Curated annotation (Swiss-Prot):
<keyword id="KW-0479">Metal-binding</keyword>
<dbReference type="GO" id="GO:0004844">
    <property type="term" value="F:uracil DNA N-glycosylase activity"/>
</dbReference>
<keyword id="KW-0227">DNA damage</keyword>
<dbReference type="InterPro" id="IPR053423">
    <property type="entry name" value="Type-4_UDG"/>
</dbReference>
<feature type="binding site">
    <location>
        <position position="84"/>
    </location>
    <ligand>
        <name>[4Fe-4S] cluster</name>
    </ligand>
</feature>
<comment type="similarity">
    <text>Belongs to the uracil-DNA glycosylase (UDG) superfamily. Type 4 (UDGa) family.</text>
</comment>
<comment type="function">
    <text>Removes uracil bases that are present in DNA as a result of either deamination of cytosine or misincorporation of dUMP instead of dTMP. Can remove uracil from double-stranded DNA containing either a U/G or U/A base pair as well as from single-stranded DNA.</text>
</comment>
<dbReference type="GO" id="GO:0051539">
    <property type="term" value="F:4 iron, 4 sulfur cluster binding"/>
</dbReference>
<dbReference type="InterPro" id="IPR036895">
    <property type="entry name" value="Uracil-DNA_glycosylase-like_sf"/>
</dbReference>
<feature type="binding site">
    <location>
        <position position="13"/>
    </location>
    <ligand>
        <name>[4Fe-4S] cluster</name>
    </ligand>
</feature>
<dbReference type="InterPro" id="IPR051536">
    <property type="entry name" value="UDG_Type-4/5"/>
</dbReference>
<dbReference type="GO" id="GO:0046872">
    <property type="term" value="F:metal ion binding"/>
</dbReference>
<dbReference type="InterPro" id="IPR005122">
    <property type="entry name" value="Uracil-DNA_glycosylase-like"/>
</dbReference>
<feature type="binding site">
    <location>
        <position position="162"/>
    </location>
    <ligand>
        <name>uracil</name>
    </ligand>
</feature>
<keyword id="KW-0408">Iron</keyword>
<keyword id="KW-0004">4Fe-4S</keyword>
<keyword id="KW-0234">DNA repair</keyword>
Length: 196
């Protein structure tokens, strides 16, 4: 199956009750020019409206953070574990994650990313479990990368905060940006001002 056919399946999915509340399923978008896939938790209201991932305030923060690293948003594939918006933007439950996980596994199998960046605990837990590992608290795995196989693809899974958490707690912004810099191979050198 190719990505376009998979995304059509996602748009018409009724595997869990979330399909009753959505305006649009949000399969994901972007290219694999850098071999990177970014995986969030679930769409929010803006994403549900647009049918595109990370287009609301959290998406703007992510896009700005990528831009600071010289990374164009369209050069990475961006998606979520859960493809439909949970009511009131609540955290997706286990049933919803399990219903959508086969879609994410298929996306990984088709796109064959070298690196996956998990944003937030729901994404980290789901992807770590696919690698045969566990993640109970984000603090235990945040800022770290793990080697493993998902969908038969050898990947490096790197974990950081979800941008929505950074919006709620702006003190996390620097750490979020540093994690992304490390994950994209830029290290912290990009943030050093040579004039100081």
């Amino acid at each position: 199956m190719d990505l376009q056919k998979l995304h059509e399946l996602i748009k018409n999915c009724d595997k869990c009750p979330l399909h009753k509340y959505r305006k649009n399923a949000v399969p994901g978008e972007g290219e694999m020019k850098l071999g990177v896939m970014i995986v969030g938790e679930a769409p929010g209201a803006s994403e549900d409206e647009a049918g595109r991932p990370f287009v609301g305030a959290a998406g703007q923060l992510l896009t700005e953070a990528l831009s600071r690293l010289g990374v164009r948003r369209g050069d990475v594939f961006i998606t979520n574990v859960v493809k439909c918006r949970p009511p009131n933007n609540r955290t997706p439950n286990r049933e919803e994650v399990e219903a959508c996980l086969p879609y994410l596994i298929q996306q990984i199998g088709i796109l064959k990313p070298r690196r996956i960046i998990a944003l937030g605990l729901i994404s980290a837990k789901a992807l770590m479990e696919l690698m045969g590992r566990r993640a109970e608290k984000l603090g235990d795995v945040k800022g770290k990368c793990y080697q493993g196989r998902i969908a038969g693809v050898q990947v490096e899974l790197c974990i950081t905060y979800h941008p929505a958490a950074v919006l709620r707690k702006p003190a996390l912004r620097g750490e979020f940006q540093k994690d992304l810099a490390m994950f994209f191979g830029g290290g912290l050198d990009r943030f050093l001002d040579p004039s100081k």
